[in-house]
Amino acid sequence: MKYDTSELCDIYQEDVNVVEPLFSNFGGRSSFGGQIITVKCFEDNGLLYDLLEQNGRGRILLVDGGGSVRRALVDAELARLATQNEWEGLVIYGAVRQVDDLEELDIGIQALAAIPVGAAGEGIGESDVRVNFGGVTFFSGDHLYADNTGIILSEDPLDIE
């Protein structure tokens, strides 16, 4: 499904929070939406592997990486795993790498930047926790919609027709 965040903001102005314009699109899908699962980790993506092995149909993994762009939390291998398990998208408050490969995958990926250095894989972090970045507080179960214009968040799913 294609999402237009500008149109959704016009229709649901009172019901959505708009994330500050910090993110760029790195995935093969220009727009995506779904229910989020939150993760908080810093320069370590081990927990992301565990979560992305689950079925992700209708879901988005939202990762608070502390805004660090020193190490990439998502690479092509991790994004392929997410695609294979039908995740709608990844929102990374941090960095990604192997961007040429990422843009070939049928998944939405929004992140702050790209860097060639990979993350540690020790599994340090927490999931299903409240996270805050870009002027918005995110909870697992919220609904997120993203496109090349921006990212918006709603407590409830928006009626898209």
Curated annotation (Swiss-Prot):
GO BP field: negative regulation of RNA catabolic process
Compartments in which it is found: Cytoplasm
Keywords noted in UniProt: Cytoplasm
GTP-binding as UniProt keyword: no
A GO molecular-function descriptor: endoribonuclease inhibitor activity
GO cellular component assignments: cytosol
Family of this protein: Belongs to the RraA family.
Subunit structure: Homotrimer. Binds to both RNA-binding sites in the C-terminal region of Rne and to RhlB.
Annotated function: Globally modulates RNA abundance by binding to RNase E (Rne) and regulating its endonucleolytic activity. Can modulate Rne action in a substrate-dependent manner by altering the composition of the degradosome. Modulates RNA-binding and helicase activities of the degradosome.
Protein name: Regulator of ribonuclease activity A
Gene expressing this chain: rraA
